[in-house]
Regions:
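C-terminal beta-signal and terminal closure region of outer-membrane beta-barrel proteins
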Residues: 210, 254, 285-289
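Outer-membrane beta-barrel architecture
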Residues: 36, 46-50, 62, 150-152, ...
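C-terminal beta-signal and adjacent terminal beta-strands/loops
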Residues: 58, 67-69, 172-175, 234-245, ...
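Gram-negative outer-membrane beta-barrel transporters
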Residues: 64-244
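Outer-membrane beta-barrel signature, preferentially recognizing the C-terminal barrel domain
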Residues: 1-60, 132-147, 211-215
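A short pocket-lining beta-strand/turn micro-motif at the edge of beta-sheets
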Residues: 226-228, 257-263, 268-274
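Short, surface-exposed loop/helix-turn segments at secondary-structure junctions
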Residues: 244-253
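Repeated loop/turn-to-beta-strand initiation elements of outer-membrane beta-barrel proteins
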Residues: 55-59, 159-162, 227-231, 271-276
Length: 289
């Protein structure tokens, strides 16, 4: 999104099919070697227990927290155009000949149609985005907290040796505290200067957002008898929602959880091994995103 054009379209009530400004087109990102980056620093805290209630059975539980300062990442093209909009709003349409917005957003000169369209917007007219200089920067403090559960069971039978393993990861907190320009955007939105419909991406509560699912499960079972070994495994990733899309009724676009199963068969020789494997046995397709 070019949120300068988006804001103009919203306040003027423009027809979505008008072709003078395009706020939903793609934008090129240009990056160069980042300078003056600070090293990321993290503090890790964890507590765990280990239980062995039966011979061959081990159960583990670990709760952990990771706080990382000076997290390195991208401010984001959408956030850059939102900051460009904020500077334009603060300027109030004054002295447009000398107005300079966000220097990271490089635009074409506005043509006469765009200038005429901006006349009733209270903003200085700007042309379409050519590209956005979006270099890596130290963004914020990121905090992730969760719990890992592990169950391991090994036992022998007359039919062979069995090994079962389950690992579950449950994320309770994934938060990124804003800093710098992003903190300025948050304050502007809280004050009402920026419209609430403009999403500020990459900060705040990120759990369940854009691939940050809150749980993951892996299950692995192995049977071995003499030179033969068969292993089956499953991987389940939890659901999340895609912030850039909404359904027609305004609700979130949810991406459901996904489970895949794998199978391998191996035969062991004295100094070699033959192994046949099939990943995603059921040919499960990833959910639409």
């Amino acid at each position: 999104y070019d949120y300068v054009y988006y804001h103009v379209a919203e306040i003027l009530g423009l027809d979505p099919d008008e072709d003078v400004i395009d706020y939903y087109g793609s934008m090129q990102r240009v990056a160069s070697g980042a300078e003056n980056l600070k090293a990321e620093e993290s503090t890790n805290t964890s507590f765990g227990i280990v239980l062995e209630p039966l011979d061959g059975l081990t159960i583990t539980a670990d709760t952990w927290s990771i706080e990382k300062e000076n997290t390195i990442g991208l401010f984001g093209r959408a956030n850059h155009t939102t900051y460009d909009l904020l500077l334009n709003l603060l300027n109030g349409g004054n002295d447009c000949a000398n107005f300079v917005g966000n220097s990271a957003v490089v635009r074409e000169d506005p043509d006469q149609d765009v200038i005429d369209l901006f006349a009733g917007s209270g903003l200085c007219p700007v042309g379409p985005v050519r590209y956005v200089n979006d270099n890596y920067i130290n963004l914020a403090t990121r905090t992730i907290e969760g719990t890992d559960i592990g169950v391991y069971y090994n036992f022998e039978t007359s039919f062979g040796d069995f090994s079962l393993r389950y690992i579950g990861t449950y994320i309770d907190l994934f938060d990124q505290t804003p800093d710098g320009d992003y903190s300025t955007l948050v304050s502007a939105q809280q004050s009402g200067l920026l419209d609430q419909s403009i999403p500020l991406e990459g900060f705040g509560d990120l759990l369940g957002l854009d691939g940050n699912y809150d749980e993951k499960h892996t299950l692995r079972a192995t049977w071995r008898n003499g030179p033969w070994q068969v292993t089956t495994s499953s991987l389940t990733k939890g659901e999340f929602y895609q912030d850039s899309l909404t359904l027609s009724d305004g609700t979130r676009f949810e991406i459901p959880s996904m489970t895949t199963h794998n199978l391998t068969v191996a035969y062991y020789f004295d100094r070699a091994r033959v192994k046949l494997g099939i990943n995603n046995v059921e040919d499960e397709r990833a959910p639409l995103a």
